[in-house]
Structures are given as C-alpha cells and as structure tokens.
C-alpha cells in the first residue's frame, strides 16, 4: 500500500497539529518560541504517556477508564512510602508495581466475570480513587498541598532538559517508540489486533487471549504509575487528585488518533499525535485566556465529533446504500 495512503490519517493529524500551533501563535506569539513550545508540553504530556498503552487496550476490544484514579493512587502511595522513611528509588519501584497490579486487577475481573470492560473499570475507578482518598486522609495529606518534602534532585527531574528537550517529553518519545514497536512490529501486537477483531476466532486460533489482555491492562497501569511519578516530580508534591483531569483528554486522544472504539484497529503514531493535538488545544486556550470550563467543554465536543465521524466512516457504505434506496424510492 502507498505509504501516503496508509498513513493518511496520521499525516492529517500532523498537519492539523502544525496549523493549531500556528493559529494559537497568532493569538499569543509566546507559543511560537521553541523553548516555550517544548516546555509547555510538560503540563500535559502525561496524557500521551497513558494514551499509548490505552490504545492497545481499546484496539483489543477493551476499555479502561480507571487510569486517572490509578495515577492518583500511585501518586499518594509514593508520597506515603517516602513519608514513612522508605528510600525514594525503592518507593518508585513499588509505585510502578502497584500500577501494574491495578491493571492486572482490571484484566482479571474482565476475563473471569465476562462483564463489559467499561462497567468493570468504572467500578475500579471508584475503588482506586476511594483508596487514594483513604490513604491521603490517613497520611494527613488533605487539600491541595499533598505530601511534599521530596529531595531536590527528584523534584528537579521533571523540570530539567536533555539537549534542550524536557525530560517528560523524552519519556513520552521513548514510550512512543516502545509501544509502536510492540504494537506494529511484534506477534503480541498482531494478537492485539486479532483479539479486537474477534476474540472468539482468536481463541480458536490458539492465540493467548487472556495473557495478552493481562499484558495490555498491566502496561496501562504501569504507564499510569510512570505518569504519577513524573507528576509528583513536576509539582513537587504527591496528591490523590493528580490524575483526575486525564480521563477525557486521554480517551479523546486515542479515538482521535484513529482507534476504533469497538476494537480491531488503531495506531500508536496516531494516538501520539492526537495527544499532542489535544494537549496543545488545552494549552493554547489557556494561554489565550479561555476558562478551563470552556476548554473542557471543547475537549468533550471534540470527542463526540470524532466518535460520530468515525462511526459514519465505518458505516459509510451502508449509509450510501440507504440513501440510494431512498432516492430511488422517491423517483419511483
């Protein structure tokens, strides 16, 4: 297939991203400064880090809306462990393991109950979120202050750069490469697509369906934990609400990136570009003085438009056939 045609959606997203940056640059010229542009990604790049493995979950025919609560739980756990005197490197490792465990819990409940993944992860969203609030209350970390006192080397980590590129953005680029290779260049990635197209056929084809689902959900949980660590480093405090605003932007990024909400198709590159598109939309509106409520409403509207557009695109042949029948009936 012609590469231009194969990656037409990704090319369109890249062009739209450039247009968006230029448009906001006309409103606020600071956004056209390369340093401001790069470092402004630190405010939203964790959305992209979570959206990448979430793409694999959605392509497999699943759904995970608990990652925001997982981020909050992992963040406050990191703070509590450090507060109890645990060495920070060990606390970070345990936090990453906790994120993976949250993902495994989601996968286990989905596989062994057969309940819709949206319902299961809705329940675990409240479970993890409630656990984060409980842990926060027990540690006395209520309100917006959270748990602070982290070493300067840790709090500086998310604010330093390498070759002029902010460290969170470097993490995002590394994650992009890793998940692109995993999804588009390995047997596991092929299995994810096949499971999303038909889990029953995949089962009959001797594809390890359960193991694959455990892996993609665990990776989403682990990515949530990575996002939690970066956010704690960036803000300098561990709070239970750090991932509260991630749900809609991340899902919007995955769907806008080309993933079929019913499973079977999707693109890591598309999700990465869409995450930047959604992030710069929020950032640009904020720099233009638009209130957060309007920014959130626009993100929600964007998700609705994308879902409707994708649905029309998927069923365009049936729509054209219906329209043709209607026209012929009127002519008769």
Curated annotation (Swiss-Prot):
Query: What is the protein's membrane topology class?
Result: Multi-pass membrane protein
| Domain of life the protein comes from | Bacteria
Q: What induces it?
A: In the absence of AI-2, repressed by LsrR. Induced by AI-2, via release of the LsrR repressor.
Family the UniProt entry places it in = Belongs to the binding-protein-dependent transport system permease family. AraH/RbsC subfamily.
Q: Share what the entry says about its subunit structure, partners included.
A: The complex is composed of two ATP-binding proteins (LsrA), two transmembrane proteins (LsrC and LsrD) and a solute-binding protein (LsrB).
Q: Which GO terms describe its molecular function?
A: transmembrane transporter activity
Does this UniProt record's set of keywords contain Cell membrane?
Answer: yes
What would be one Gene Ontology cellular-component term for the protein? plasma membrane
Q: Identify the coding gene.
A: lsrD
Protein name listed in UniProt: Autoinducer 2 import system permease protein LsrD
> What InterPro entries does the annotation carry?
ABC_transp_permease
Q: What subcellular locations does the record give? A: Cell inner membrane
Q: In its keyword annotation, does this UniProt entry include Cell inner membrane?
A: yes
Q: What does this protein do?
A: Part of the ABC transporter complex LsrABCD involved in autoinducer 2 (AI-2) import. Probably responsible for the translocation of the substrate across the membrane.
Which keywords annotate this record? Cell inner membrane, Cell membrane, Membrane, Transmembrane, Transmembrane helix, Transport
- Listed PANTHER family: ABC TRANSPORTER PERMEASE PROTEIN YPHD-RELATED-RELATED (PTHR32196), AUTOINDUCER 2 IMPORT SYSTEM PERMEASE PROTEIN LSRD (PTHR32196:SF71)
Q: Membrane-spanning regions, if any?
A: 7-27, 45-65, 70-90, 91-111, 118-138, 162-182, 216-236, 240-260, 261-281, 288-308
